[in-house]
Amino acid sequence: MENDMEEKFEDWKGKEAIPGKHGGIRAASIVCVVVMMENIVFIANGFNFVKYFMGSMHYTPATAANMVTNFMGTSFLLTLFGGFIADSFVTHFTTFIVFCCIELMGLILLTFQAHNPKLLPEKDKTPSTLQSAILFTGLYAMAIGTGGLKASLPSHGGDQIDRRNPRLISRFFDWLYFSICSGCLLAVTVVLWIEEKKGWIWSFNISVGILATALCIFTVGLPFYRFKRPNGSPLKKIAIVIISAARNRNKSDLDEEMMRGLISIYKNNSHNKLKWIDKATLNKNISETEVEETRTFLGLLPIFGSTIVMSCCVAQLSTFSAQQGMLMNKKLFHSFEIPVPSLTAIPLIFMLLSIPLYEFFGKKISSGNNNRSSSFNLKRIGLGLALSSVSMAVSAIVEAKRKHEVVHNNFRISVLWLVFQYLMLSVSDMLTLGGMLEFFYREAPSNMKSISTALGWCSTALGFFLSTTLVEVTNAVTGRLGHQWLGGEDLNKTRLELFYVLLCVLNTLNLLNYIFWAKRY
């Protein structure tokens, strides 16, 4: 929405924000640093939890894997809750402070349990009720906190940028994603190396220190930030508009004068989208602004829905791709053996190098196009979806090659073969998630920035859950045909390559669906 450029911002004292003193690059840079630190904590613990659940809490591998997947998915899904709080009741700054404290308390609780042998199960025993209660309380306190942080930080950073400068907003979101990738890289290299040398418990210790430092850094920036005060629940307003439009669906059309008024006020928006919403203006208590905001938000949902399958493909990096790596030759030299999680570092390094190049060439490509917020980012997302289809095809070829060499030649191919799928999926994620964060922020109504940017993270969550469901459905269907594609514990006896082909087909169909909605937007 472009009609939000006249928004009023305040400083931390409640006075009108002063350009040059409040907001700007300095304030947005603080947000990028905090995003990097938050992502170090989230990713490092995502890798650490599997070892912790299996080694210290004595859960089975399958249970531990599901616990991690559920934690990751829930964390991303709760960004909608965090976004709702930020847009409806308090500022993005306050949302961050509250949810960061919640995550920090959950992390401290898990660290305390890890250091206290009495709160851990004895050898070869499962956790007691008390031990499980402490574990899940700390775990999902972290998930709640993560949801609030990931929802509030991009919007808070975007609010620091002058919206009359679309290029600067685009640059901010490019470097925001650079910060996310930097956090991932540090997590899978430095933190993982310390964990391998010093033990998994160090991951908790480091995470507490980093998150506490991030909280302090973010708070120190208070005098430099500018804030937009929320004015009630936007979701409630949307519900009222939809209900009113439904009740008035059989009434006469809006008169020509009112329609002209709508078009003149929102001439930058496509008034032909969701015209049935206009019926809501027959209710005198509903403003034309509320109708247009509802139309805008509902128009984002098909784009959001079209990215979930791609997120399902990305989820394979932490599931089957990791299992493939365990069965491959991990030695790079005679004595050096690369940990499978560290394979992620290779595409991350490439992405960190490619983001500045992407920003440069993207700016050249979009020069003279003032509508980068929609058409440019829609093309960026579409390219990411297309690349994920290619990555699944490559994954199928690599798995077929790996299994053929093991079964017929008793030879384990190098783990570096996985770099191709890691690389393409990571670049696909950069294009899609990075594009979604900017697209949803730029296009969202002014009072729904956090909820709308949370849609990008929510897509990732639903992708994780869809992956779990798809595996179960695939096994159920193929089991009836005689042999489960993904059944059993021996990956060499599965048909993982066919599952990758299935994902390739589904994602290609999803790409066609996305193109349909993107053209209509």
UniProtKB/Swiss-Prot annotation:
It holds the Pfam family PTR2. It comes from the Eukaryota. One of its GO terms (cellular component) is membrane. The keyword NAD does not apply. It is a multi-pass membrane protein. The chain crosses the membrane at residues 30-50, 65-85, 89-109, 133-153, 172-192, 204-224, 297-317, 338-358, 381-401, 413-433, 451-471, 498-518. It is found in: Membrane. SUPFAM superfamilies: MFS general substrate transporter. Belongs to the major facilitator superfamily. Proton-dependent oligopeptide transporter (POT/PTR) (TC 2.A.17) family. This is Protein NRT1/ PTR FAMILY 4.2. It comes from Arabidopsis thaliana (Mouse-ear cress).
